[in-house]
């Protein structure tokens, strides 16, 4: 949500927006936490980056985290900007605790309509269905942790802790659902003021719709006092080690690297050097999913090898290309990615569209790619291509949010055997980040000459063929593979990497062992 705002503020200072633990791409805690815990984790981020004096901005729940950081680190935090500073009455807290409980998942997808309406009713001026979609996508991305942040916010004694803050505070108060509650903060601050923002211009989404204006308000306040020279000390960056499960075996780390179209996000498991007895495995996801699809199987296969799962450009957290591209272009990016890792040999694993990327990658790196494993092989007839192109069209966002419900119902028939609705929702929620590139993956897949390109591959190929929407198409791979086989998997389907992880991993492990 802060992307455009960060660009403005980052013109003359370091600007960082960290995902709270359990939200965005930050690793979740094992159980619900309180605002004090969120603030402590953010303090650890500052320490690990070697950051000295800072200014802190928070919005809604983030305002409470900002106040707590200021109290925990009074000599480090210089000034605070709060976008809304809600001080609740006890009756309001009881009401909010009831209203902001999780919405149960519904097989018909109606929970998405409820969530959409919750955000739509408080949209700010200039916020259209596209922006509301982004807000919804971020909200449901947290899954069952959706309500953890709200419950922590309602448990926090915000008024009392606000009184303790001795740093200067600017409260930006748009005319939104917290405007009345924010006015109560006026008499609680030692050194602060509330700036009421015009209701016809500012509200939810103002960081996206009016980033220049918001940045101007913030910059004027922060720059009113001289800064210290130790805001960031590059020599200290990364020197402070924080105890973290990120060092534990089987931990899936998230990182970014540069690509030809911006930042490329990827997940990886990197076991200790002594345990790396097998070639690295690179995984390519289906469209419009992300590398998140491989997390559970990465933990099993990553015990004796490096396993990486990059998000294809335009999906997950990877930045999109400027226009629709082809499978060959995706493979070029993944070629760069592998070469940057310095791997001499790799095995690759592609899921649906990712199977085509894996195939094309062999054509780019025939000496490095030793084995190709495919989760389905999309080999279409001309009639099937015409049908798929008609059904997998770009999504049009509607003000009532029914496009999400319709898409949920579109994929629902392919719910895999024994796949819990929670797993289906997690996979589906990844697709909700539909920006302009949503349909580009399908477009590229339907344009790719899979049979022709696969027939030219002389590396060993294993096609895992579960009973899903590509079952019949994948059988055709047996007629074009030079080396390898199609492995039919009756009783398996979508979600099998989560519901039958060990069985799928065992088949892959045996195939790539030579």
Predicted features and spans:
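Helix-rich cap/lid subdomain of alpha/beta-hydrolase
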Residues: 83-136, 142-151, 375-428, 434-443
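Catalytic active-site module of serine/aspartate enzymes centered on a nucleophile-bearing elbow/loop
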Residues: 192-246, 484-514
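Conserved hydrolase catalytic core segment
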Residues: 52-91, 344-383
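Conserved HGGG/HGGXW glycine-rich cap/lid loop of the alpha/beta-hydrolase fold
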Residues: 1-27, 267-317
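Conserved serine/cysteine hydrolase catalytic core
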Residues: 141-187, 433-479
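N-terminal cap/lid segment of alpha/beta-hydrolase-fold proteins
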Residues: 239-264
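Active-site loop/oxyanion-hole signature of alpha/beta-hydrolase fold enzymes
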Residues: 16-59, 207, 212, 270, ...
């Amino acid at each position: 949500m802060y992307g455009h705002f960060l660009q403005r503020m980052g013109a003359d200072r370091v600007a960082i927006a960290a995902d709270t633990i359990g939200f965005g791409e930050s690793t979740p805690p094992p159980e619900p936490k309180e605002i004090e815990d969120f603030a402590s984790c953010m303090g650890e981020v500052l320490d690990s980056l070697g950051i000295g004096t800072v200014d802190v901005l928070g919005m809604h729940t983030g305002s409470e985290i900002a106040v707590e950081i200021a109290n925990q680190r009074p000599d480090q935090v210089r000034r605070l900007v709060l976008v809304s500073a809600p001080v609740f009455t006890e009756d309001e807290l009881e009401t909010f605790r009831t209203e902001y409980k999780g919405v149960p998942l519904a097989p018909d997808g109606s929970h998405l309509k409820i969530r959409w309406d919750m955000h739509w009713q408080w949209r700010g001026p200039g916020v259209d269905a596209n922006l509301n979609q982004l807000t919804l996508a971020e909200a449901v991305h947290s899954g069952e942790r959706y309500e953890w942040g709200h419950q922590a916010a309602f448990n926090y004694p915000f008024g009392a802790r606000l009184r303790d803050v001795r740093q200067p505070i600017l409260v930006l108060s748009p005319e939104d659902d917290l405007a009345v509650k924010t006015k109560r903060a006026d008499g609680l601050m030692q050194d602060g003021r509330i700036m009421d923002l015009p209701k016809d211009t500012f509200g939810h989404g103002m960081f996206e719709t009016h980033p220049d204006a918001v940045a101007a308000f913030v910059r004027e306040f922060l720059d009113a006092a001289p800064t210290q020279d130790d805001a960031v000390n590059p020599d200290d960056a990364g020197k402070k080690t924080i105890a973290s499960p990120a060092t534990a075996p089987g931990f899936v780390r998230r990182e970014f690297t540069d690509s030809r179209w911006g930042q490329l996000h990827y997940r990886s498991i990197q076991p200790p050097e002594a345990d790396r007895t097998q070639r690295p495995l690179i995984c390519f996801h289906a469209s419009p999913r992300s590398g998140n699809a491989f997390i559970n199987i990465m933990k099993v296969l990553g015990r004796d090898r490096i396993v990486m799962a990059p998000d294809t450009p335009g999906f997950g957290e990877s930045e999109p290309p400027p226009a629709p591209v082809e499978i060959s272009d995706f493979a070029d990016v993944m070629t760069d990615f592998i070469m940057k890792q310095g791997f001499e040999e790799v095995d690759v694993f592609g899921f649906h569209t990712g199977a085509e990327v894996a195939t094309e990658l062999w054509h780019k790196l025939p000496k490095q790619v030793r084995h190709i494993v495919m989760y389905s092989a999309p080999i279409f007839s001309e009639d099937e291509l015409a049908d798929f192109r008609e059904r997998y069209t770009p999504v049009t966002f509607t003000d009532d949010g029914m496009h999400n419900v319709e898409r949920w119902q579109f994929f629902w028939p392919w719910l895999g055997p024994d796949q819990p609705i929670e797993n289906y929702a997690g996979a589906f929620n990844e697709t909700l980040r539909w920006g302009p590139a949503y349909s580009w993956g399908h477009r590229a897949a339907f344009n790719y000459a899979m049979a022709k390109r696969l027939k030219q591959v002389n590396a060993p190929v294993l096609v895992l063929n579960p009973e899903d929407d590509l079952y019949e198409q994948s059988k055709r791979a047996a007629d074009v593979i030079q080396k390898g086989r199609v492995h039919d998997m009756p009783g398996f389907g979508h979600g099998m990497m989560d519901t039958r992880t060990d069985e799928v991993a065992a088949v892959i492990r045996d195939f790539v062992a030579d």
